[in-house]
């Protein structure tokens, strides 16, 4: 599919998520995720998090945007709650993916060519699951941008935000996802339509569950890495083609990169709370 078509579809879902959240939550586009993080006037040290995020993402580290950005604004109490919810998300995703792909691997060869008569169903399924996943993901991670904005955003500012977001998507699709895309592409059979559809569907359901659980922000990155971890272990268990000595280093590398991102987040929050503005939050 041409990247411009995907950009148009993604932009449509994004604009729906943005304006629906704004209308439903009284001008707050965070979907209530910032209820425990009051608005603060932007200070110079708040730029540390986006700066680190840009650097780590460019080198392919699957850093948690929620931890890195919100840690500069949240209290240590809220950060602890975010960490616990994200750890639970990682564990739930890994276990669910393992169980699901044990079953899927027994009845479906994801790498086998799709029958011509079935292709339309898988394509529709992929667009459907990806669209709902995109909306659910936005309802989680919109808070990472909304934290810099007033909790009640006026219409004129919303129009500017919408334009900036759509332009950002245009750049991202034109670049093809960048180095961070390798986290997915290096996994077993993730390029196939059936694999992508099932991954998107499972990821969507898990994120939706945690969205409805409570309004504490969480790392959607951790959930995704946990899902890929469980899937890789399941496929190695069932097929026997992937030796565990090959799978474990792959999983370990992703987990290590996650810890690098977490360490950066902790560094930001400790610097702000105990060095730059001690007792300020």
Where are these regions (language model features)?
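Multi-pass alpha-helical transmembrane bundle typical of ion/small-solute transporters
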Residues: 1-281
């Amino acid at each position: 599919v041409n990247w411009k078509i995907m950009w148009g579809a993604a932009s449509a879902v994004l604009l729906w998520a943005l304006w629906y959240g704004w209308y439903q939550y009284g001008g707050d586009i965070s979907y209530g995720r910032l209820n425990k993080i009051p608005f603060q006037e932007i200070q110079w040290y708040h730029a540390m998090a986006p700066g680190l995020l840009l650097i780590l993402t460019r080198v392919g580290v699957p850093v948690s945007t929620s931890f890195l950005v919100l840690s500069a604004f949240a209290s240590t109490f809220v950060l602890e709650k975010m960490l616990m919810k994200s750890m639970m998300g990682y564990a739930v995703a890994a276990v669910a993916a393992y169980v699901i792909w044990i079953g899927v691997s027994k009845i479906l060869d994801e790498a086998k060519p799709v029958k011509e008569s079935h292709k339309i169903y898988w394509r529709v399924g992929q667009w459907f699951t990806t669209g709902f996943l995109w909306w659910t993901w936005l309802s989680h991670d919109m808070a990472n941008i909304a934290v810099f904005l007033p909790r009640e955003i006026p219409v004129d500012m919303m129009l500017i935000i919408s334009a900036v977001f759509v332009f950002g998507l245009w750049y991202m699709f034109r670049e093809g996802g960048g180095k961070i895309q390798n986290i997915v592409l290096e996994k077993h059979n993730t390029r196939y339509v059936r694999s992508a559809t099932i991954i998107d569907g499972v990821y969507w359901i898990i994120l939706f569950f945690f969205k409805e659980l409570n309004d504490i922000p969480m790392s959607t990155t951790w959930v995704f890495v946990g899902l890929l971890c469980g899937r890789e272990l399941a496929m190695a268990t069932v097929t026997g083609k992937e030796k565990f000595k090959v799978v474990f280093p792959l999983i370990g590398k992703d987990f290590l990169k996650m810890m690098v991102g977490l360490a950066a987040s902790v560094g930001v929050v400790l610097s702000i709370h105990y060095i730059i503005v001690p007792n300020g939050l």
